[in-house]
Amino acid sequence: MSTPPRIREDISRMVDETPPSGKHRGIGALAAVATLGSLLFGYDTGVISGALPYLYMPHLAGGLALTPMQEGAIGGTLLIGAAIGAVTGGIMSDRWGRRHNITILAVIFLLGALGTTFSPNVFVMYVFRFVLGFAVGAASATVPVYLAENAPKRIRGSIVAIDQLMIVTGQLLAFSMNAIINAAHGGPQLIIKANNNPDSLGITKGTYSWDQILALQASKGGPLEGDQYRAFVENLVIQSGNGAAWRWMLVLCSIPAIALWIGIRLMPESARWYLAKGRVADAVGALKRVRDPQKDGPLDAEVEEMLVTQQRELENKYQGNAFAHVWRTPWLRKLMLVGIFLAIVNQTTGVNTVMYYAPKVLEYAGMTTSASITAQVANGV
């Protein structure tokens, strides 16, 4: 679809006359700020692995006295929220704008981080894990689009790839902070004032590591089956413990959430979103903020290309055949099928199980809680 000469002249005149909509921001700075959302994605999905061993501790020791079913639900509520967020995130960004959507998500990330940190019980934890999951899913649908629409063609692939890099960096950061916080606390410990069980099993007044209590379970070679073990723990008179270490692990992701909220407000909106709303002058002003004339050349051709693409998208939308257009176009169909295949394979590898529960699995393999939390860092690397 060619552009009439008169429209080209209008585009050229608009590019010349329209000033930047704000201070110039390099595409590197824009990517660094936007992918804080990706970093939060990775941190919030990975941090729970180190928090779970502490969450299992009794309430008086600082934990939430989790059961295995509740442990699974804590991971599941985040995934349910992520599924809903992924579906609605694109709708939100189409309606309000990519930048505006990321600003909202930064607030949701912060709310979820603080909510999980100060959860008094597991049911409140469920609610805020769902909130975090929504932010995670919506970020996965918004951040890559924002990067792709703002990046110049010459480095678009590299810029969008930063999204995935920051996700795994967030997971590595979560595993590393878990290990550091665990080491600072000396591993899960509790102080027992008395043991009201008929058979003390060697547990009397004093300070014990949580591993010593866990070793009483039949699944770890101890004498107590599931219900017997839970009854034994309930009959312990606990003075205190360091189980609240999990709160420090969870609260740390509030820092990048605040940084994202501040940083994204200094960045321009997507020029392509402006064009979709018919705001051509705003699109030109936004492009001028993130383009380097010496490296990216004049904006006339880019704006013209964006207008042509937008016109095609509108035609397909009005004809109601957007999906049919993708399916009939060989290279688009191939991209879609490859993307679906990779997404399915990625999930069937069981990577989420390792990410959430590796420390628990390693404990059953004979490692101490502290060693298993530290070993999880290798998974992040």
Language model: regions and residue ranges:
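Transmembrane-helix signature of 12-pass secondary carriers
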Residues: S2-D292, P298-A301, L307-V381
